[in-house]
Each structure stands twice: as structure tokens, then as C-alpha cells.
Amino acid sequence: MSAAAPAPQWLSTTLRWGPAQIPLQSNSRPVLSWTRDCFTAELPAPAGPVAATAAAVVVDDELARRLADACREPVPGTEMPAQSGAAEGMLLVRPVTEVISRRRPVDRSWPELIVFGLAPDGDWYALTTSDPLGPRAGELLARQLVERHLRRAGAATLHAAGAVLDGQAVLFAGDSGCGKTTLAAWAAARLGGYFLSGDKAGAYVSGGTAMAVGLAQPTRFGEGTLRSLLGEQWWQDKLPLPQLNQMMGTDRTGKVAPGPFKVVLSNAELAALGVRAASAAPLAALVIAAAGPAGEAAEVRRVPPGEALALVRPQLRSSWDLLPFGAGESAERRFGSTDGALASVLERVPVLVARWRPGHDDPAGVIMAVRDELS
């Protein structure tokens, strides 16, 4: 009779984000140390109160088994065969494009590899990327830990960009192309503020105060926004080298090719370019950015409280849109934001509508009009 396999020795550390303490466990000391370092490097300190959490994230192999069975093939990078058990603590490594393409086409460049894990409460996590030394390393873990923390706090996740001005956050929500990222970038780069988020942000109530939180998600910037951020014609020379293919539309030299493109930058990279970034701050207002009519000046107005929820509801988003789920089980159903979470925030902050034309109207003028409306 063969001896039983020894039980894995779990190691522990604590990820700290302001007052929040998030325990992390793994049976690999290098993974544990690297994860802690990546999390710390990706997230600047919050600028406001953040509730503490005690739920641990444990690296586990259950999702690895499920994907191996679904693929009917061995998992690259491991010894795990399809449709069989795996050793305790084994990590799954699969090309991320194979995982994401089952849900939707992906235009942006993603890291080549992701390691999946399962927390004790059943939450799935992508725990690392292919290059632990690259600028993308840790962003998935950081984002997911923050999102998990916010879900427990009853946060609403919004399709919104955000900036911090005078110690308070303003979230610019709206459909794609409405200029929300441009407004947030101008507030940070030109008006002495901090960049919070470019496409998705959380809002929740802590101790009676509405809070806005960025989700540690890199932002895609267009040429016009980047020029306004860096303030000169040759802004391309300031961008980090695309060692992880973070630029879309580059030629063989790594420089930006002619034509439309987006550049993907994290908040940490923005800070390296001289644009100050924040993780969280008390929320002052939520602004719905919308296209203004041609030939008319930009307009900012306050929304009556009774109309605010219906106006903001279309901008609610799921916290998770990356990991695979079972047939008929959507990320929105598991992790979607609720009207109750949003209503709790809107009871405490005003909602404004800013109608303007990106590329024609002055972003600084729109932001100053928002400030005037709130004063």
C-alpha cells in the first residue's frame, strides 16, 4: 500500500490596501512573494476610507480541472491530464486568448498566459500573467481583489471614468465615445487633479459617505487624449516601450504607426509619465457625459433626484467579464451590480448631465462648469 501524498503546506501573507487587509495563501513561497510585490506596485494608496476585509484568497486547482476537462486535452505548462484529478495546489496556465475568445473577440493585446485559482468562497481568480517582471504583471490580481472587496461592500460597478479634484472624486459615466476618459484625463493633467479610472469604476457607501474607487484596470487612450496628457507634439517618445505589446497600432520599430490607434496604460504608468493617479476618494458627483447637438455650446445641468436612477442604470456593469462560466451562467448574473447598490450611492451625491462634443468643445470648460454646478 503506497503512502498517502503529503498535504500541501500553505504559506500566508497579507496584501494591504490602505486599512484593508486581504490575506493571501499559496503553497509556493515565490508565488506568494511575487503576488504581494505585484499588488503593492500596481495600486497607489487610497485617498479616503476603505473598509477592512478578512476573507483569504487561496491558490487552488479546481478551475484547472474544469478547464482541462472542457478542453479534453492536457493543460500547457502543467503535468495535469484532461479529465483527471490534479495535485493539490497545482496552477493552471493557458493562453489567455483561448479562454477569452469563447466569450467575445478581443482587439486589445492581453498578456500571453494567465494562472487561474479558486477562493474558498467560490470566487474565481486569474492570479498572474506571463511575465512577472513586465509592467502588466499583477494588474489582473489587483483588479480582482479590489472588485471582490467592493462586492462585499455592496458597490455598484459603473462604465465610468473618474478624477479626483480638491480631494473629492467625480465619475464621468456614459456610452463609448462620449469623452468620459478625456474629461478625467484633463482633470488630472491640466487642472491639478488625480486620475482615478478610465473606463470602469466602483461606487459604494462607507460609514455614510459615498466613495469612488478605481478598479486597477489599464485605460486605452486615443491620440488626442495622450497629446493633452503629455502636452507636446512628440508625446510618443515619452511612452514606455511596448515590451508586452501594450500599444495597438505599432510598427516593427515599436513606435506608433500612422492612423487610428489606442495606447494601453495603467495608472502606475501614467504616474511615471507625470500624471498623478489615485485609487479612491469620497465621491462628490456622478456626471453622465452625452453628445451635444452641433452648433450649440456645451451644457451642464443637475438631474432631479427622482430621475437619477433611471438615467444612470444603463451604465451599470458586471465586475467580471474575463473568466469563463458554465453554460447559461453569465458573469452579469453572478456579479452584476444592483439597483439597490446604486440607489444607496445616489441618495448621497447629485447626478449631472454634461452635453458636449469631444474634439470641438474645451474639456476644461466642461469640468469647470461641473465644479460651478457643485459649488
Where are these regions (language model features)?
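Post-Walker A alpha-helix
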Residues: L183-A184
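Conserved lysine of the Walker
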Residues: K180
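A noncatalytic interaction/capping subdomain that flanks phosphate/NTP-handling catalytic cores
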Residues: M1-L171, S176, A189-L196, A201-S375
